[in-house]
Amino acid sequence: MQTILFHPDAAACEALERMTQRLDDVTVLCASCEELFESGLMADGAVVSSGNGFGIMDGGLDGVLRALYGERLEARVKRQIIEHYGPELPVGAAVVARSEH
């Protein structure tokens, strides 16, 4: 499995490079969320977002994902949380929602 870490700030990318230089399966890219998704690198991959326990995707990486993949993605995340955990996703738990792209 290949892991891609990304950040738009060059100094942050340099720090990530230093921390992961011995890890063969980690790639650091200096790019914004939009640039990363538009590059096609994520075509067959998965995106992990820490999000929040209610599935509200209105800012940060979640906001970018909702803007790119639509409000239906947010609805699927919320539905997964409710179906599997009730009104709130417990700390440490996760749900999987397809982007349909």
Question: Residues of each region from the PLM?
Answer:
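Macrodomain-like recognition of ADP-ribose-binding/processing modules
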Residues: 1-101
